Amino acid sequence: MMKRLIVLVLLASTLLTGCNTARGFGEDIKHLGNSISRAAS
């Protein structure tokens, strides 16, 4: 029972971390695109 709970908590934390990382990566790409647009104009 305890092993199952630990695995569940680790899995949940991994999924949540992955979502935050993907969102941060998307924002970085957006900022990069804005910088390129400003440099081009």
UniProtKB/Swiss-Prot annotation:
Could you tell me where this protein is found in the cell? Cell membrane
Function recorded in the entry: Acts as antidote to the effect of entericidin B.
**Which species is this UniProt entry from?**
Escherichia coli (strain K12)
Any Gene Ontology CC annotation: membrane
Keywords assigned by UniProt? Cell membrane, Lipoprotein, Membrane, Palmitate, Signal
Q: What's the protein called, per UniProt?
A: Entericidin A
Residues carrying lipid (S-diacylglycerol cysteine): C19
User: Could you tell me the Gene Ontology terms of the biological process aspect for this record?
Assistant: response to toxic substance
Give the UniProt family note: Belongs to the EcnA/EcnB lipoprotein family.
Q: Which domain of life is it from?
A: Bacteria
N-palmitoyl cysteine: lipidated positions: C19
